[in-house]
Amino acid sequence: GVVIHYVGNPGTTARANRNYFESLSAGTDEVYASSHFIVGPEGEVIACVPLTEVAYASNSRNDDTVSIEVCHPDETGEFSQVTYDRAVELTAWLCEEFHLDPEEDVIRHYDVTGKLCPLYYVEHPEAWDAFLQDVAAAQEAL
């Protein structure tokens, strides 16, 4: 499956979030966090962890999911249009690549742990439903 996250630190870049994850690999803290992909504020996508490896992002679902972190401009956690569009494209590509059904196999971090992530799409379930519909349409277009 695919798990969608938000970075939780408004206004930051994909590179800054990647660098944060990379700094954790030094192992000086007891913090383990990573993601397969980060979608940045300009729609850029940074691949952080190979798809053949586990990213530490979704607790009990780390072993069977691909994680996507999405940057957001403000405290609401709503993705900008460019990041939304790129997250839809990336998620659709992953669904096609791994023969996944967006309605069943794309989930929020919240759906695994109860954490309010991605915040806007937990607080606005209709926006989450629209995201899944957009992913399904994008997958069909591939």
Residue ranges and their predicted role:
Residues 73-142:
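Basic/polar, cationic surfaces and motifs that engage anionic cell-wall
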Residues 1-100:
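Active-site-adjacent loop/helix surface patches within enzyme catalytic domains
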